[in-house]
């Protein structure tokens, strides 16, 4: 049961990072046990060659209940589709189990690995619970690893637009949720005061904002935050929109919204991330 809970937790964690992870049946190796999965993120720079059924991408862990039967069914749903690294690849199996139109051969980065090895270690150590009648129930063990530094690389691989030189960190791990970027020069002084008011308003609404109050060139500021990867921006330039503010989701076109509408957008996005069911 615990193994399956971790299986679901890993899928949800990677989804919060806006990454599509493929769980693949893996060899337990010297660690032992009879159940193991590694989680692979597709990436051209990946070190692992993978062979999978494209239909696995249509699966969704949303709505999965934390119940023994439901979790086991979820895991088996994923295991139903062929997905292996080159260490376990068998050409005959691949061609037999996967229709030609659904075969995918590509590269990926391993970002997580989970093992269930039962009582392999607890039994020799006699680590368990004494039961009535002189019996003993040995502790069931597992190992659960996540490659944090690998995840950083995987996110950059997935979210950086090299052509436009724009990075957009997922909201769940972004250094800030929104950047306030005002045009400030000797001819434009009102923007600074306005940007400070917006900053304080957002902070009071528990929005993690950063204000660039330097006199750096306006377009350079925007380019800087595009590279840093803050997912949302408020731009205060020469144009006035009355009560509306120029709001940008990094890498997309801007739109004119009220401050209340911006709060709503950010709140809804955060709720999507943290309330996966």
Predicted feature locations:
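NTP/phosphate- and nucleic-acid-binding module
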Residues: 1-277
